[in-house]
Amino acid sequence: MDVIRNICTALAFTCLSCLVLPAQGGYRVEGIVVDRFGPVIGAAVVEQGTSTGASTGLEGEYALTVSGPSALVEISCIGYASQVFEAALVPQTVILEEDNEFLDEVVVIGYGTVRKDDMTGSVSAIKAEDLNRGALVNTQDMLKGKVAGLLVTPGDGGPGSGARIRIRGSASLNASNDPLIVIDGVPVAQGAGGAMSNPLDLLNPNDIESFSVLKDASSAAIYGSRASNGVILITTKKGIGTAPQVTYSGSVSLQNISRKVPVMSSAQLREFYSKVYPPGTATGVSIASLMGDSDTDWQDLIFRKAFATEHNVSIYGNLNNRMPYRASIAYSGQEGTLRESRYDRGTADISISPSFLDKHLSFDVNLKGVYSYSDYADGSVVGRAAFFNPTIDPYWRNSDGTIDYTTTNGYWNYGNGRGEAFIPNTLVGPSPLSQLYDNISYAHSSRFIGRMAADYKVHGLEALRFNVSAGLDITATDSYNGVRPGSFQACSDTENLAIGQHTKGRHVSRSTLFEAYANYNETWGIHNLDITAGYSWQNNWWSDRDVTYFNLTDEIKLEPGETAESRYLTYRRENYLVSFYGRINYSVDSRYVFTFTARSDGSSKFAKEQRWGFFPSGAFAWNIAREPFMDGLDAVSELKLRLSAGMTGQQDGIGDYVHLARYNLSNDPYHTYDMGAAGYMDMLTPQAYDPLIRWETTVTYNLGMDFGFFKDRLTGSIDAYVRDTKDLLNSVQVPMGSNFGNRLMTNIGSIRNKGIEFSLSGIPLQTERWSVQLGLNGTFQSTVFTKLNPTEDDNYYIETGGLSRGTGGYLCRQMVGYAPYTYYTYMQKYDSDGKPLQNEFVDLDGDGAITEGDRYMTDKSASPAFFYGLNVKVSYGDWDFGFNGHGSEGTWVFNDFASANSTSSLDLNSGSLPNQAQLVRKTGFRAPNSAQQWYSDYFLEDASFFRMDDINAGYTFRNIGKWGTDIRLAAGVQNVFVLTRYSGMDPEVLSENGIDGTMWPRPRTWSFRLNVNF
């Protein structure tokens, strides 16, 4: 590390010496700069109006020659209030005071920044020090429980898995409900695929400076057609100070699953079956023939304790106070708790922001790259392991007890014969170990995102500036999926017996962005006018290709006479978005603030007649605390009322050519025909299409208030909102005889979201040694459909949400007056002890039979009625401690795992013997479940919960050695515990419909972290 430090320091000061030309024969100023903790390293000491400057060293010392004793010397450092002295009056020791309002004062918004006092929209800004701490591999983990109205549902236990992010609920039926994510001014392409399926995977969490979450139309309308689901602006760290600074952070972690699927052990299973199916009965005899004499915990065999590590190195500084720079590299490696799974990621980030012409001309260059590699394990093996026969030895054995690798690679499976004569029982499928070890699936991805911007402040008219930028986002992913030769899966392939086949895929995506805008910002007395007008052009392009090979020879799998080009087509698509936008901010004495925003978008996803959409908004803010009648109320430091209304649009998630008739060539070899010497392929009839399909549009109304008391020791905000989305994209029935498919995607429907959200931050204790900070946020929300078809038929519905058992049925309905994915179930009957009566339900229509007419619409769905976050930070001297948690109330989950495994009834025709869930002891079900039992409201459970996301503690050693190094040692736990009444694996179900078929359990992580600042 010293070598890196020395090299970086030498390079930086070499450049500095080339750029700084100190005055000759002038007045010499020298001294030290400190804060309340000690020396301030890297503070800028500059003679105002010149390029003459210096930076403080390791002990805070500096020396500078200025033009004369009356020259003005400015001493500044990021995060501190600047101080200016005449050269002759500079004290020997300059004490800098922390500028607590530095990061609070300016908030990043679309295409610029705004002073917090002048902000009219509903925007939540999170600073770096307020983000969740700990061993963070995923960027979304930093946001959990931090922002009112922002719901982050983590993915499953797979390493590198993404998350579902929703801002103020879901407002679309078939289009995307994901927010727009903008990283350093570049909108991030969603769904890059493969190992880059997580759109935030591009970022190293240690590189992030702040988040801004734009929630209402006033703040988000500047992004127009992509902003209906809100916008998350991510700003990465830039160079600060002057002298080069080097930081290192690293961690090691141990992960284990917090719980297993509750099933019986082999001893419990033998006892249970002997009671339910006595040995003398026919079923008992069949069970005995399928039982082994082993005691196998299949879940223990597929899971493991997993290790993870991460390392981050960065260097930053500011050459001559004119070129802030920062560079970082990082690596993270994470084993999965499922064996055979792993995730590796390397990132690099470079940021340079030089300025010229007395800072009138500036450039901003941001380059980010990431490489990731994923070994995937089949998550469905969790359920298979839970219910696979625990009395069976997991391996084929030779007579001497060694493993017989000639049969399905040594892993025991249901079937007949051994070795090459083995015939698999395909009704059962592979054993857990075969499924885990003999399936091969991996992907590696490379991604680059870059942006270059030039900003010119007009000489003589400094209020006017022009900004031009270009951005590029490129992803390339190579994937592989197949099975090992000799495996159960390969033996099941009748066409390529014991050889099988595998598929290689290639996915490439590219997003190109060009933007230009002008900004005019002028202040006349108590009046301030800020005008922005701009143009944006974006092209998104994708290419996908999959090729199938023989496993052993790696030869392309072709039919006689075929070519690879004819069999394996490359699918390409693209779209364009052209936009004009503008914003006007006008304030009077920072008391009355008006904002008007408009954006016009033209999208190639729609026909010419519907291509352009216009999205306006307006907002007003009244800073009541600045009114004269508030004078003397010293307890009130902030009180601001906000009103806004506006329109945003939605074009994502609907395909690129939905307004066109799309004909497709079949690549099925059985759909080719020979006529003489010529061969012909099927041309598939297009699906029905609507040439006048148009934008989904959302109108949002927001009323909010920001407040602060006791010099901002207590701050907070409260917002009430209503979002009306119309022209929902919905799939409707096509009349018979149209010669199209039977469904049509068109604009029919509307949905309303409304809610109240609040956030509170308090500092109940602040002394020289002690600091206690508390944060709490919460959101009450509801969502209902207000229209779903053109006839205003309130009985119209859309079925969705299939179960793992049952055939042809759906559990959820979309219906006017109800929330999305409302459960549609049978009402279970119970005995006098409260136990469910198997296959008995309430006859709601009174016809004497249990039919489809006895199902009813519940008032329950997976959308929480209230969700919240809790954050606590405590410090004493150099010690720090904190924890973060989040939870929800009024969330209902259908336990599909319980529904599918609620009876001990057996079907032995498949030739296999399953394990039993512990649940069967509770239900007492012995007969086969009826079709209605799978859909019983008995399995509908309250999944309200509180999750302790992380607990961490650390100690900082300050100003160590000749480099003045700060070292922080910390330890923490993530996913500490969950408080819930839900009986399933985890109350946070990733599927939006709330159907829980069990999943790869989210791990608990124990970590140790080291941070070093040179």
PLM features: residue spans?
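Short, small/polar-rich motifs associated with maturation and membrane association
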Residues: M1-I7, C15, L19-V370, D378, ...
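Extracytoplasmic gating/loop element in the C-terminal half of outer-membrane beta-barrel translocons
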Residues: V285-S289, G429, L433, S603, ...
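Short aromatic-centered micro-motifs
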Residues: V45, I75, I181, Y586, ...
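Short Gly/aromatic-enriched secondary-structure transition segments
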Residues: P262-M264, V483-P485, V547-F550, T791, ...
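Conserved small-residue
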Residues: T247-D293, A386, Y657, T746, ...
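Helical mechanochemical/support elements of P-loop NTPase systems and associated helical scaffolds
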Residues: A135, T139, N204-D207, Y701, ...
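Extracellular/periplasmic, surface-exposed regions of secreted and cell-surface proteins
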Residues: L131, D178, A306-T309, R345-G346, ...
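Glycine-rich, aromatic-lined ligand/substrate-binding cores of catalytic
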Residues: S861-F894
